[in-house]
Curated annotation (Swiss-Prot):
Gene it is expressed from: secB
One CC-aspect GO term: cytoplasm
Record note on quaternary structure: Homotetramer, a dimer of dimers. One homotetramer interacts with 1 SecA dimer.
InterPro entries per the UniProt record, alphabetical: SecB, SecB-like_sf
UniProt entry keywords in alphabetical sequence: Chaperone, Cytoplasm, Protein transport, Translocation, Transport
Cell location: Cytoplasm
The keyword Transport is annotated on this UniProt entry: yes
One MF term in the entry's GO annotations: unfolded protein binding
Protein name: Protein-export protein SecB
Record bears the keyword Transport: yes
GO biological process: protein folding; protein tetramerization; protein transport
Role played: One of the proteins required for the normal export of preproteins out of the cell cytoplasm. It is a molecular chaperone that binds to a subset of precursor proteins, maintaining them in a translocation-competent state. It also specifically binds to its receptor SecA.
Amino acid sequence: MSDVENQPFFNIQRVYLKDMSLEQPNSPAIFLEQDMPSVEVEVDVKAERLAESVFEVVVSGTVTAKVKDKVAFLIEAKQAGIFDIRNIPDEQLDPLVGIACPTILFPYLRSNIADAITRAGFPPIHLAEINFQALYEQRLAQLQQQAGAAGAPNGTTLN
């Protein structure tokens, strides 16, 4: 094999909106409310190996806005990407898939959610940046804690 074939390779094959739903259970009455809504945001990351060097990474976001105890809207979206990753050492592969790939996908998710919210007739909500490295490290710590409690072997990966 030549040196070129052994070089680390990272390529975005595709970025796509995998799933999105928006519910407005209290429309149109909710539009008459004068109080500011409270907003809850949840984000999650999942990854799946599709082939030897091909991974699908999905960043999911859920935004719930409530006025008093009434739901103004609930939006759930999944932004996905297919990544071709080759010749990356195993110890670097999991962080690449768990940190770098979600960081690439999140701006698309944020834009799609903001667009859907405004198209639904609500003022825009802009999701703050997310530190996917901190999220990854938090999940890794949880897995290590679970592995220690269950007596699982070391080397368990997130993806």
